């Protein structure tokens, strides 16, 4: 690659409108550094802002979520027609590689070996890849169904450890508490030395592998929250164990954020999990179950769920579950549980 090479990086999952959540495409940031190291001039775009006027030699189109894959492929086709050499990739393609192949692209759905190990200072970091949580039915379903979590198949069921990364305030590792003790110490020591005012372990810890010594180690960082999941009723005992450990070291319950997927169990079980999180004075983070090949449109559901019920349940769980049972929820209620003026009654 010469210094005249022009590279375009397209983030197909970039939010179409501003959201209150945090968003960062680490793959795009690493790809930019890799292309620059090859001497390329790098430009960035989204499917709505890119140009297919033939001004780029190479292009990489990334999709984090499966429902952005069709837009990513359309963008890739336009760029290919303009004469650019185009690659597509990202976790969104995990269950959709055959779709990409049918349209002429060999999708890189696992961490790209060129980009993943590219050094640099990023807003987020992986100190490890993989997840050995064999007890998790989302990544390791026992009934032969397709997994809802892609991490074990995409990154491996064993942890791959990295010790040559630059610390960042957002830690993305999928299962920190299952990492070898020495590697956890390395992460904490280097992150602490970086002097960040706040640190977020975004994917968090696994209840089954969380121990008192885990809490004692990670409490030395200025964590914005202690994050872990309560995704199945069967995890209740392990979740309570973690809460008890955090109580022992003085962590306030409001600093505990518990992920809770909705739609993987019947409504009654999912509601029980959310209401228990509220009863424990912790913060629920309710997420809707989506198949890994979900392309958008009507959402396939199982058990006694409908898409409308899932949407309502997520809003109830995150905003109003402290005030009422799900049966009393009305979409017309505001965040304080007050019905807007002039609205009707009932659901």
Predicted regions and their residues:
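A short, structured N-terminal alpha-helical element that caps or precedes a catalytic domain
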Residues: 1-98
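Core AdoMet radical
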Residues: 9, 58-66, 90, 140-242, ...
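Short catalytic/ligand-binding loop motif for oxyanion handling, primarily in non-cytosolic enzymes
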Residues: 17-18, 68-70, 94-98, 133-136, ...
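Canonical Radical SAM [4Fe-4S] cluster-binding loop centered on the CxxxCxxC motif
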Residues: 20-27, 34, 118-163
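Anion (oxyanion) recognition and catalysis
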Residues: 36, 80, 192, 247, ...
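A short acidic, amphipathic alpha-helical/loop segment
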Residues: 71-78, 99-100, 186-190, 213-217, ...
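Catalytic core of nucleotide-activated saccharide and alditol-phosphate transferases
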Residues: 80-140
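A structural motif corresponding to the C-terminal lobe/cap of the Radical SAM core domain
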Residues: 217-227, 232-347
